[in-house]
Amino acid sequence: RVFIGTLRRHRQTAEALFDGAGWSLPCEEDAGLNEYDFHALFAALGSEHESLKASAHGDRHVFYRGLKQVLQLWSEDRLGGVAPETWNQFVERVDRARQRIARCGGQRVLVVSSGGPIAVFARQALQAPASAAIALNMQLRNASFCQYFFNRDAFHLASFNSVPHLDLVSRPNSITYG
């Protein structure tokens, strides 16, 4: 079975995978696999975080540092403004998607999602704090894959952020980040 978020990039990624593998599989969409709205999180920063707001428009290094701080504030419910969803609502949304996927029994499942939900999955498997999800999210590579072993009662991380299909001497610039 294949589960994807409802974002256009999720469908595009699934289609590219299917084209490359010669597969033709139906996709089950689940909004629980969608990324958080990082633009809205920056916009929700209160006046006490004005300098941090500017990092949303900086170069990628400035943006990365700013996003990491914004995610930490979000996870602590300290943005200062109103976000589309709280950190806890985001985690609960992702967890509902994970529980739906876990009901697939012994089937192999492909999930196409985004960095935030992927990091939350890993955090849940590791039973780690919110700060771990943020740290994991910030190191995810584009087009990486993670592998989990799961059933209705257990959820275990087997590999994280793997890119053997990109980590080639002949393609030194193929590994990119968010």
Residue ranges and their predicted role:
Residues 38-44, 123, 168-173:
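Short aromatic-enriched loop/helix-cap "lid" or pocket-rim segments at secondary-structure transitions
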Residues 11, 24, 92-154:
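Active-site-adjacent alpha-helix immediately C-terminal to a catalytic or transition-state-stabilizing loop
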